[in-house]
Amino acid sequence: MAFWLPQNIQKRLLLYVLQQISLFSNIDLSNLDVSIGSKSHFSFHDVNLSLDDLNIPNVQINEGIVDELVLKLTVSGGVEIDGSGLRFIMTPLYSSGSQELHSDFLVKSIQDLTNSMLQFSDPLTTYNRYKEDDISSSDSSSDLNSNIEASKPAANGSYTLQNMRNKALNVALAKLKIALKDVTIRFIVNDRDPSDNIVEVHLESIQLITTDANLRHINIENITISSIQKQAVPDSPVHPFNNDDLSQSVYLSKMEATSLYMSAMEEQSNEDPSEPQVTQEEQENDKCKESLMEINNLNIAFKGLSSVNDLRMSNIVIDIQDVHLAIHKIVEIKNSTLKNIIDIIVTHLDANESFSCQDSQSPSPDKQEPSALSSVDIKCIYLNLGQDITVILKSFKLEQKENNSLAFSLGSFYSNSSPLTISHKTKPLLTGEQTPQSIALNMGDELDIIISHDGIAHFFKIFQFVSKCMSFYQNKSKGMMPQIASDTKRTVQLTSKAVKLSLKFPYFLLCFQVSPFIYDSNRELYIELVDVFKKLPSRCTKILTMSSITISNLQSPLQLGSYDDTLKEALIYSSVHAIIKEVIFNEEYSGIVQLVEDISAFGKLFTDSKNSECTGKSKSKRGSFLQRSVRVLNSSRFVYKQSLSANFSLKIDSMKLKVSEIIGPQFGSVEALLSNNFFAITDDSQIVYFTKNLKVERKTPSLLEPQEIMSVVLNKAVNEPVLYVHRRANGKLKVIFNNIRIHYYARWLEILKKNIGPDNASSKDEPVSQKLSKKQPTSGFPWELKCLDCSLILHPFRLKSVMVIVLDNLTTGGSSFIPQAKLLSKANTLFLIDDYQNFKIQKDKNWPSLINFYAGQGFSAIGKIDTLNFLINKSDGALLLDCKIEQVGLSLCADSFQTFCQLCIDLKYPQTFPDEEKFRTQLKNPIDVFKDIDCDLFNSAFIRENNHQNDYDSVHLVDSFLDKTHEFNNGARSKLSSQGSYEMDSSSGTATGGILLPHESYLDSAQPKEEDTPPIASKEQERDVDIRGSIDVEKVVIKLFDGYDWKYTRKFIANTVEKLDKELSKAEASSSKSNVPQSEANIFDSIYISANKNNVTDLRRNLDGEIQGVQNSFSDVSKVNLRPSKHYKALIQLNKVHVNLKNYRVDEPDESNSDNSTDVLNRCVVSIYEFEIIDNVPTSTWNKFVTLLKHEPWPHSSPMFLLDLEFIRPIDFLQAVELVMQLNVAPLRLHVDQDTLEFLIRFLGFKDKRFELIDEYPDIVFIQKFSTNSIKLRLDYKPKKVDYAGLRSGQTSELMNFFTLDGSKIILKSVVLYGLNGFDELNNKLKAIWTPDITKKQLPGVLEGLAPVRSFMAIGSGVKTLVTVLMSEYRQEGHLGRSLKKGGNVFLKTTTGDFVKLGVKLTSGTQAILENTEELFGGVGSNGRVYDASKFGSADGADSDTAAVLDLDTLFEEDQLVGSKYSRIRDHEPTAVVIDMSSPGDHNEPTIVSLYADQPLDLPTGLKEAYSSLEKHMHIAYDAVWRAKGQMKDDKRGGPSAAAVYVARAAPVAIIRPLIGATEAVSKTLQGIANQVDKTHNEQINDKYKSNRTDS
C-alpha cells in the first residue's frame, strides 16, 4: 500500500534536496505548489551551483555546472534524481585543521533535512544529541543558534514531530534513486602554478538503485582519469554565482499539484561574454589530455542508510570488470604535480590517523567494529608499461572473513609481449590473508619472467617514479604522522615458490633461477639458492651460484666494522644488511667481455639517473665520506673511529671465481678465492668493498700443480683487508692491495703470441699510440691504485730462478680512457733465488716484515731501489714513458750476479726466427753475372789497338798537393784537439812534415754512395716515433762480494775440494811418495784449484782466506767458508745514468708488398755522467780501480760513458736485425792491483750451466758498424805473482807481472769496424788492433811508468830542458849568466817534485824494512805506528801482540783460488804494503794501508806529523826497555842468563825503533814538501791509496 505523503512534507522534502545540492538560489518559488500526482517532476537546464553552500570535506569547489537536472517525486514517497552534464572544478585542501570528516558531513546533511522539515522542533534536543555523539560543525552550530533564538516549541510536542520527521526520511531513503550521466570533475592540484597539470575524472554514468531489504546498488560505467596540461587557470569561477537563496522561494510557494518546468532564470539567462572563450579553452585542453586510468564497469552493492538513526553501511561488495592503467603516462607526471598529490594524500592520512589515535585513546568497546567491506572482485587489470608492453592481472579478489581478517588472491599474472613475457601454470598465483597483526602471502606457483632491454628501461622508469613518490612522501610525512605503538604494526610474511627471471640479450639469455624463499618482516628474507644460467642457442651453462642468502631490514641501523682509505678501522651503520654464505662464478673470458658489453647498455639507464641525482645533491654531502667520528671506550682510553651511514650492506663469506680461456685454451683457467668479503653502498652513492683473504691461481692440464698468481704473504695478528676498493661520490675509484704477492710469468707471453687470432693479426702491427687513440672518450673517471707491503714475483721464461720486488708503498693513479698515469714507489727491495722450488713457506711462523720473510725463506737480498717515479703520457702521437729513480743499490756475488743478468734477459719472450725467415737463401730468378762484361777487353788485339791512346793518360803527380799535405795534417790535428777527442795517433811520436797523417774518421765523414750508407734515424723518422722512453737514475751503487749466495754453488765447490782431497789420498796410497801427481780442477769456468800432497791441508785455508779476506796461518780450517764475504771487494758507482729509448713506427709487409727498404726499428742511448770502481780487496792498498783522468781536456758537461745503439732491419720483409754501435769513453785513470784484477776476472767469468739461455734458433747479433773514440788511459799496475807455466806456454802478457807500473800512458786509438758477427768477434778484432799498436808505437809511454825508470827519466827530462834553455839563450844573447839562472829555475821546477817523491819512496821502503827486521827479532813491527800504552803495560800484552801480528808470508801467499802453479815473488815493492791493526773493525780484522796514504798537505803539516812520529817511536823504544827491566826484576830465576835473554829481546827494539821513527819523520817531511810544490799531487794520492782516516 502506497504511503501517503502530505503536500507540506513534499515541499519541505524538495526544499531539503534543493538546499543540499545548492540549486535555485536565484529562482522565486513563492507561488510554487507541489502536486502529489504520480508524474510530478522538476527539470532544470544550465544551472550554476552556489559555491558558498556547497561544502565537501577536504575539497574547495571553484565551479559547479549542471547541464540538465530532473527531480521526480513519487506518490509512494520515493525520490528520483536524474542529471547529465555535471561539471565541477575543485581544489584540494592542504590543511587538515578545520576540515570535516565524512561522518560529520553525513550527520550534518540529516540535521539540515530535519531543520527544513520541522521548524518548530526543539533545537536543544537535536544539539544535545549531536553533542553526545561528539559531532559538531560550524555550519550546524550556527543554524542551531539562530533557530534557538527564533522559536522555542513546547516540550510535549517535540517528540511526536521528531518521530514524524524520522519516518518521512526513512521513506525517502528507502525509495531513493539517482541517475547521473556525463559527470566531469577536474582537480586543480596547484592553483598557484597555472602551467601545472590538471587531474580530470570523467564518469559516463552513475546509478544508485535501492532494492528490498535496504540493499543498494551503485553502478558506474566508464570511469576515466586523465591528466591535462593547462596553460592558464582563472583565479575566479567562470560563472559568477548569485548569493540569493533559492530555498526561500520554494519555502513560500503555495501552489499544489503543479508540474513545474523551469528552463531559464532571469539573472542567469543573460549570456556571459566569457563563455565562448571557456569553451575554446576546454577544446584546446582536450587536445593535450592524457588518459591515465580507465575502468569500464564498477558495481558497488551494500546494505545501509536504512533509517535516519542508522546510517551505517555494511556488506560492501565491489565488482570491477576491467581496469586499464597507463603506467608509462603516469610516470611522466610533472614533479610539481606529483609532489602536490603526495602532499594532499599525506595531509588527509594525517587527519584520519589523528582521529583514529583520538578514538583509540577513548575507552574501547568490548568488541571491535567489523569492517564494512565484504569483498572486492576485479576481473582484469591491464598495466600498460609502454609500447607493446602490457601486463595483465586477472581475478583479483578481496574478501572479508568472519574473524575480522581479509583474504585476497590473484588468479594470474602474465604478459605475452616481446619485451616482457610472464607466465605460470597453476591458479591462483597469489593468495594471502591480512589480520590486524600480520599479513601472510603465499605464491602458489613458479613464475617465469623474460624481459628485454626495453622492458628494463620501462621498469626502471617505474622504479624512479616510485622512488620519487616515496621521497616526497617521506619528506612530507616527517613530523606529521603520530607515533603508533609497536604492537599495532603488522608483520608481513611471504612464502614463495621458485622464480625464474631471464634477461634477453642480442645473442643469449641470462636466466636467474631463485629457489623457494621465505620472507618475514620481523626477521629476514631467506633464499636458499640462486642460480644464474647463460642460455645460448646451442648450449646452456651455469655461470653463477649464490647460496644461503639472508636479507634483513632492521628498525634500527646495524653497526658494522669497516675500514677507511688508510685501512684504519671505521664503522658503518646500515638498515638493510644482507649475508651470502657462498658465491660461485664460472665463465669464459670471451663470454664475460660480451656480457659486460651488453650490460653496459643497461648501465646508461643508471648513469643518466645518477647524474641527475648527483646534480641535486649538496656539495657538503659529496665529501662527507667517513667525516664523522665515533668515540669508542676501549679499556682505559678512548678510540676514535670514523663512521658512515649506508643504504645497503652485504657480507659474503666465500667467493669462488673461475674465468677460463682468458688468453686461449692453452692458458687454462684462472680461479680466485675471496674470503670474508664486505660490500656497502652509502647514502651519498659511494661504494666500499674489501676482502680479508685472497688467492688467485691458474689451472691447466699441462701443469701438475696450480700456478699461483696472487695470494696473501704474511699471517698477521691483525686481520686487515688485503684488497680494498672504494668508489667516491665524484666517481674516483681507489684500489688498495695490502700484504699481497703478485706473480708475473714470462711464459704467458708465449701463450699470448700463439693465441693472437687472425682478426688481431692486422692490429698487432699497428703502432701502440694509434691503438691507444682509438675509441677514447674525452674524459674518464679518475682512479688510484696502492700497493702496501706487497711483493712482485718475476718468473723468467726458461730459468728456474725468481726475482722478488718488495713494494713498501707504491701509488699509481690516472684517468680511465686516457693514456696517462703516474707511479710513485718510495722503497723497493730486491730479492733473488736460484731455484723457486727451494722456496718453502713456513705457515706457522709470524714474520715481522716482508724483508725478514723472504730473507728467512732462502732468498738473497741483492739490492734496493729508492724513490721511483714513473710517468705515462701521450704527446705528438707518441707514447711517452718517463722513469726517474733516485738511487739503485745492488749487492751481488759472482753466482747471484750471473743469475740476475740472465734473469733480466729472460723476462721477455725469446723471439727467434729460422734462417729462412731472416735471410733470402734462394733467388726467384737466376742472375747472369757476365751480362755486362766485355769478353774482348783483355785480348791482345784490343790492348795493342788502344795502347797508343794511353801514352798521355798516365797519372801525373801534382807537387802543390803534396806541399799542402803538411798543412792538412796540422789543421786536422789542431781541430781534433780542440774537440777534445783523442783520435790523433800521438803514440807514433813526432811526425815529420813529409809523412802523411791518416785521418781515422775520413771514411766516416766522406759521403758514400746511397746503397752503402748505413741507416741512421733521420728527422722524418724522428717524427714517426711510436714510443719514447727515458730512464734517469741519479745514483747506482753496485757492491761486488766474494763468496757465493747459492747453496748449490757452495755445496758444489766443497764437494769438488773433498773429491780432490780423496783423489790425492788415493793416489798417494797407490803410488810412491815421489810420484804423487798434482790434481787440478776447474769450477764454473772461473775457479781453478790445483793441489798436491804438500798443500792439501792449506787448500781450504787459502780458499777461506781469499773469500773472507783474512788468512790465518795458525788455524785449522776443516770446512771452507764459501758464504758471501763480510765486506764487499769492489764497488761500482755510477752517477747520473740516463737511458733514452725510441721505438719507430715500421710496417711489416710481406715479400710481395715490400719495397726492399731499410727500417730503423729502435734506438737506445745510454749515457753515464760519472763512474768509478772502488777497490776494497783486503790485500790491496789502492783505492779507486777506475776513475776519471783529471787535468785532461774533456768537456765537463759530457758524460764519461756514451753508448749509442741502433737496431736496423736491412730488408723490411725479412726478420734479420743488425746493430750499429757508437761508443765514447772519457780519459780514464786506472789503479790496477793484481789481486783486485783477478777478483774481477773471477767474478765476471763465473758461469753456471743452470743459467744458460738456450734458444730454439740460436741467434748471434750481427754488428753492422762499430765505432769508438780514442780512449786515453793512465795506468798504475801492481803485480804480485807470475804464472811461469803460462809464460812457458807462450803467454807473453805474463811479462807484465814482472814490472810495477806507475803512470804509464796508453791510448786506445779510434776504431771503426764493419760487419762483425757477434761480440766475440768484436773483442778479438779490438785486441788485434789495439795490442800491436800499443806494443809497437806506445812503448815509450808504457816504459815511462816503470818505477825504477820513472825518476831517472824525470831527471833526464829536466837536464834536457836545462841544456835546451841554455843553448837557446846563449845563441840569442851570447853569454850564459842570465840563461843559467833561467835554466836553473826551469830545472828545479821540473825535477824537484820527482826528487822529493824519490826520497819519499826510499824513506818509506827503509821504514818498512826496519819494521820487518824488528818484527823478526820479536818487536811490534808495523803495529807500532799507532801507539797504545795499554798494550805495553804488561808482559801478557806483549805476548798477545806478537801473536796477533799478521805474517807477511801469508800476505804474499800464492792465490790458490786461481791455481797453485803461480809462484811467489817477494821483490815487488813490499815497502808500500803495511798492516795496521789499530783501526776498529769486526773482530779486530786488520786493515792494510799504504805508507803513502794520508799525506800532509804542506810542509808545516809534514813537520808536525814528523815530530809526532819520532815521539811515538821513541816512546815505543823506551817502553820496551822499561818493560824488559821490569821483567828482569820479576823473574824469580834471576842470574846473568835471564838478564841476557831480556836484554836480547829489548835490544832490537831499542836500537831499530828510533831508526824507524827517524825514517818516518823524514818521509812525512818530504811528503809535505812534495804536496807543497805540486798542489794536485795530494788529490791523485787520495784517489790512488786507501785512507786510514776514513776508516777511523
From Swiss-Prot:
Keyword Chloroplast carried by entry: no
Region (Disordered): 264-286
Membrane topology listed for this record: Peripheral membrane protein
Ranges in coiled-coil conformation: 1049-1075
Enzymatic reactions: a 1,2-diacyl-sn-glycero-3-phosphocholine(in) = a 1,2-diacyl-sn-glycero-3-phosphocholine(out); a 1,2-diacyl-sn-glycero-3-phospho-L-serine(in) = a 1,2-diacyl-sn-glycero-3-phospho-L-serine(out); a 1,2-diacyl-sn-glycero-3-phosphoethanolamine(in) = a 1,2-diacyl-sn-glycero-3-phosphoethanolamine(out)
GO molecular function per UniProt: lipid transfer activity; phosphatidylinositol-3-phosphate binding; protein-membrane adaptor activity
Pfam families reported in the protein's UniProt record: ATG2_CAD
Subcellular location: Preautophagosomal structure membrane; Endoplasmic reticulum membrane
Location of region: ER-targeting domain: 2-21
Region PAS-targeting domain, residue ranges: 1347-1373
UniProt keywords, alphabetically: Autophagy, Coiled coil, Endoplasmic reticulum, Lipid transport, Membrane, Phosphoprotein, Protein transport, Transport
Effect the entry attributes to changing residue 1086 to D: Phospho-mimetic mutant; does not affect autophagy
A Gene Ontology BP annotation from the UniProt entry: nucleophagy
Impact noted for substituting residue 83 to E: Leads to a severely reduced activity of autophagy and a dispersed localization in the cytoplasm
Subunit organization: Interacts with ATG18. Interacts with ATG9.
Family: Belongs to the ATG2 family.
Domain remarks in the Swiss-Prot or TrEMBL record: The N-terminal region (NR) associates with the endoplasmic reticulum (ER) and is responsible for the formation of the isolation membrane at the PAS. The amphipathic helix in the C-terminal region binds to membranes and facilitates ATG18 binding to PtdIns3P to target the ATG2-ATG18 complex to the PAS.
Note: Present with 876 molecules/cell in log phase SD medium.
Record protein name field: Autophagy-related protein 2
Biological classification of the source: Eukaryota, Fungi, Dikarya, Ascomycota, Saccharomycotina
